[in-house]
Amino acid sequence: MSDVLAELDKVLAQRKNAGDPESSYVAKLHHKGLNKILEKVGEECTETILAAKDAQHDSDTQHLIYETADLWFHSLVMLSHLGLSAEDVLNELARRFDLSGLEEKARRQS
């Protein structure tokens, strides 16, 4: 699974640094700046929430997967724009893996 994320990280970095905004969607987002990227993340988040609600009622899980992929993608573009990667998020998830959710929450509050 993480191989896909690693490859996507590479592509996002390439498009950020050398992509043509006229021919690359990712380069175009980077060119427009963080606010445009955040707008897309928010849009995809809303679409994912709506797809989850629909999936609960009509079992259309494929649409939910599609929208979640869009949300992840645009979140990765956001991370890339800020000099971060999927690996940074995976490392944080790994760090939390052995903690209970309540323990993690307590650590953040102290």
UniProtKB/Swiss-Prot annotation:
Protein EC: 3.6.1.31
Coarse class of the protein's main subcellular location: cytoplasm
GO cellular component, one term: cytoplasm
First and last residue of the signal peptide: none
Family matches, as SUPFAM superfamilies: all-alpha NTP pyrophosphatases
Pfam families recorded: PRA-PH
Listed GO biological process terms: L-histidine biosynthetic process
InterPro entries membership: HisE, PRib-ATP_PPHydrolase-like
GO molecular function: ATP binding; phosphoribosyl-ATP diphosphatase activity
Domain of life of the organism encoding this protein: Bacteria
CDD domains to which the protein is assigned, alphabetical: NTP-PPase_HisIE_like
Localization terms from the record: Cytoplasm
Similarity section: Belongs to the PRA-PH family.
This protein's name: Phosphoribosyl-ATP pyrophosphatase
Natural source organism: Teredinibacter turnerae (strain ATCC 39867 / T7901)
Taxon lineage: Bacteria, Pseudomonadati, Pseudomonadota, Gammaproteobacteria, Cellvibrionales
Gene that encodes it: hisE
